[in-house]
A protein has these predicted regions:
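Nucleotidyltransferase catalytic core that binds NTPs
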Residues: 1-90, 99, 103, 131
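Phosphate/ribose-recognition catalytic cores of enzymes acting on nucleotide-derived substrates
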Residues: 80-144
Length: 144
């Protein structure tokens, strides 16, 4: 959620519902070289915690890859992605969801683009991140 996609979705909905003549434009999440979403909260991390933090992005990438390779069941996608975090007990996952980009409601089946979104605690610092994920559309091969 561009560092906070949820806020972007709420503002877009507000502008739409109130018929405000504005175009709300989201931008990509700014990331450090190791994939960690840039945030003022990152300053609160110790050096050891900071070294663990890119695992959050790798978790989101695992979900994206699972979706790209054809997995459509949200539970299976989330379970696979959560395995990335299991190797890092210092990270306490608060939530990991696949949500509809417009409504921010969790989905059970991925048949359209979604946002993989998570929040986790590393020590006393809460970090959030999200990533756009799109199901791959593979052409049907013609058998002869």
């Amino acid at each position: 959620m561009p560092a906070n996609y949820q806020q972007l979705a709420v503002v877009r909905r507000l502008v739409h519902d109130l018929n405000i003549p504005l175009k709300v434009v989201g931008v990509s999440t700014a990331r450090e070289r190791d994939g960690l979403a840039m945030s003022s909260r990152n300053r609160r991390l110790s050096l050891k915690q900071r070294a663990l933090a890119p695992c959050l992005y790798r978790t989101l990438l695992a979900a994206r890859q699972s979706i790209a390779y054809g997995e459509r069941t949200a539970a299976a996608i989330k379970e696979g992605a959560a395995q990335v975090l299991q190797s890092v007990p210092e990270i306490k996952l608060e939530y990991f969801e696949l949500v509809d980009p417009d409504t921010i409601r969790p989905v059970d089946v991925v048949n359209a683009p979604v946002r993989a979104a998570l929040a986790a605690w590393i020590g006393k610092t809460r970090l959030i991140d999200n990533l756009y994920c799109e199901p791959r559309r593979c052409p049907v091969s013609k058998e002869r």
